[in-house]
């Protein structure tokens, strides 16, 4: 037994040197990404663009001026663009164009959980004097949390996997994104003529179909209190439309990502209720998806699904450790 253990140790010994080269390799990989950076609209590659929260986080951690500029510029264009649901909050799946104007309209829990933390980190790494950008990032985080709580929370306290891209128009015909699209007449009907005219130069309409319906995009300096009030009015009007279907499946890793995002963003932006929300979600996740040391990957309407995989255990461990640090409750470390 001892000789076997010694043999294993000797076999693994070369691996101990790997961390020494990990940092420069990671830096080189991040530098290489710059070749695909869109200096005008932010993001990487194209014309189809994904937000890529993990890459943005890596740029924020790297922290040199070039990396920070790429992350901040990308986050600003994400929040101003049609890929962000200006009316209801939350990010769509990806953009079909280089300007983040016309998204694929599906909304996923994991994208929004990760981007919630990214927006808060970007806020933290942006100078105090750049208040316009900081306000954009914190606005995106707050509207995203509001959307998650309004539309994604399941009766058992967990969060649904996503929202479909398609829904029906007034005539019962199915279209992608129709639930989220506007034209000037629809905005005027909801807000009234005077308010719609005030909003017109600040919120650009990007047509997505032959009917002139389009996504909303923020322009110029934002008067947040008034625009948020207008968006809330539009949200109420939109609530009378046929909504996209919700994927009612609860996925362990994705809910754990949200725990991590709520803790991180709550601590950074001093939204302490988000940390409490993360604690409640962790409690629900532990109750619903854990049994005698084994975890579920999924559940559907409280019916257990398949067993957990490595991703689920990793994200639960990470998020529970962060929650323990934020709350001082050792029970999350025990879990």
Residues covered by each model-derived region:
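Replace the tail clause
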Residues: 1-268, 299
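Long, K/E/R/D-enriched contiguous segments that form extended
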Residues: 253-256, 261-333
């Amino acid at each position: 037994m001892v000789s076997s253990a010694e043999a294993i140790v000797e076999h693994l010994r070369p691996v101990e040197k790997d961390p020494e080269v990990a940092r420069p390799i990671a830096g080189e990989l991040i530098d290489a990404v710059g070749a695909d950076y869109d200096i005008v609209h932010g993001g990487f590659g194209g014309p189809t663009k994904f937000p890529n929260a993990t890459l943005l986080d890596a740029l924020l951690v790297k922290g040199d001026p070039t990396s920070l500029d790429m992350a901040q510029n990308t986050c600003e264009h994400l929040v101003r663009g049609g890929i962000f649901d200006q009316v209801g909050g939350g990010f769509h799946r990806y953009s079909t164009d280089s300007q983040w104007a016309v998204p694929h309209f599906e909304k996923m829990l994991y994208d929004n959980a990760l981007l919630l933390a990214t927006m808060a980190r970007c806020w933290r790494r942006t100078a105090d004097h750049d208040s316009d950008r900081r306000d954009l990032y914190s606005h995106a985080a707050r509207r995203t949390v509001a959307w998650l709580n309004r539309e994604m929370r399941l009766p058992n306290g967990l969060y649904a996997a996503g929202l479909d891209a398609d829904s029906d128009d007034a005539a019962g015909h199915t279209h992608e994104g129709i639930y989220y699209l506007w034209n000037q007449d629809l905005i005027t009907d909801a807000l009234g003529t005077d308010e719609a005219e005030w909003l017109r130069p600040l919120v650009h309409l990007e047509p997505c179909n032959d009917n002139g319906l389009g996504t909303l995009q923020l322009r110029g300096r934002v008067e947040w209190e008034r625009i948020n009030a207008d968006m809330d009015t539009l949200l109420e009007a939109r609530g009378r439309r046929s909504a996209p279907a919700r994927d009612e499946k609860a996925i362990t890793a994705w809910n754990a990502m949200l725990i991590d995002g709520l803790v991180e963003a709550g601590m950074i932006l001093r939204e302490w209720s988000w940390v409490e929300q993360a604690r409640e979600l962790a409690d629900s996740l532990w109750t619903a998806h854990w049994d005698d040391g084994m975890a579920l990957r999924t559940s559907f309407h409280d019916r257990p699904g398949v067993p957990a995989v490595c991703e689920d255990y990793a994200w639960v461990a990470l998020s529970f450790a962060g929650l323990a640090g934020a709350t001082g409750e050792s029970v999350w470390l025990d879990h």
